[in-house]
Amino acid sequence: MPLDKPTLVAEVKKRGLKSVSAVLRELGTAEDEKSKAGLASMLKGLWGAEYIDQRDARFVNDRVHANIQKDGTYSVVPRTYGGVTTADELIRIGEVAKKYNVPMVKYTGGQRIDLLGIKKDDLPKVWADLGMPSGYAYTKALRTVKTCVGSEFCRYGTNDSTALGIALEKKYQGFEFPAKVKLGVSGCPRNCAESTVKDVGVVATEGGEWEILVGGAAGAHVRKTDVLCRVKTQAEAIAVIGRFLIYYRDNAKWLERTYDFVPRMGIEKVRDVIVNDSLGLGEHFDTEVEKTAAAYVDPWLERDKPVYPGQFAAARSIALPVLSS
């Protein structure tokens, strides 16, 4: 793809290109397998429900909505909003683990439960029995919103971090980005949700305000977040974070995490665009948030209506002939 991202986006919009094959046909110079996944992500963000999904443009994980493991089985991570679950959900998870002989059930660092070792042809049945939405643990999208218990239970909490985390996760579930995105919401500066090393973090401060942080990392590369701004209400926090997420989605390079994106753009510029609305894009960001949220459909519902024949069929083994010497 010979065009930089801003030029590519402008051409795609002008020509109304809504599928990867259409973009490659009109704007590409050669068939490029490596660019397909990035184009698919970009087009889904641009067009929402109008995007024409071609599964051969996506990685195997995205085709079956589960994360393939080294032995060819898959992991299933249901959505638990803000890391909060219920007795009924836990019972169903346990029943599924027994019914399908799941070899490992593991708590994740993002306050979720991972069922590992699921056979491909069991995926639709597992999803149906769980009765929970996809946690998007397999793709470049919003993953988790980690929370502490906040002011509802903790004697140190200065604000309701759990409620904000749940609201954020429900608002932005299914949003896809150039790379995965993880959030954290801490109910006080003790930072039990590790918000200062998330792609987007929120920390409650004295006086009931929320401090919004961006560009953190806690993996192979560790980076403390930059302070974006402070806001007074939960609604303001959700809105500011939405604007940042769309700005990141529209301007980041494919596979560029926020911890690279924010330093590349510069926190002063990011703050100017998001908080001060220096480019006059605030209304655009808000519109894109609502359009993307409206286009959300739980991908695990494909269990009832697969997109293509054999989508969840087990891989067939092929017996090779024995060659005589």
Residue ranges and their predicted role:
Residues 1, 32-35, 148, 188, ...:
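Short cysteine clusters
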Residues 1-39:
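Compact, charge-rich alpha-helical regulatory domains located at protein termini
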Residues 33-36, 49-54, 102-109, 140-141, ...:
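Flexible, glycine/charged-enriched surface loops at secondary-structure junctions
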Residues 44, 48, 98, 102, ...:
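Generic secondary-structure signature for well-ordered alpha-helical cores
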Residues 52-66, 138-141:
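Long, charged amphipathic helices and adjacent flexible linkers at domain junctions
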Residues 74-207, 211, 306-325:
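Small-residue-enriched alpha-helical segments and adjacent helix-cap loops
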Residues 148, 182-190, 258-270, 290-294:
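A glycine-rich phosphate-binding loop feature that marks nucleotide/adenosyl-phosphate handling sites
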Residues 187, 191, 196-256:
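Mobile "lid/hinge" segments at catalytic clefts and subdomain interfaces of large enzymes
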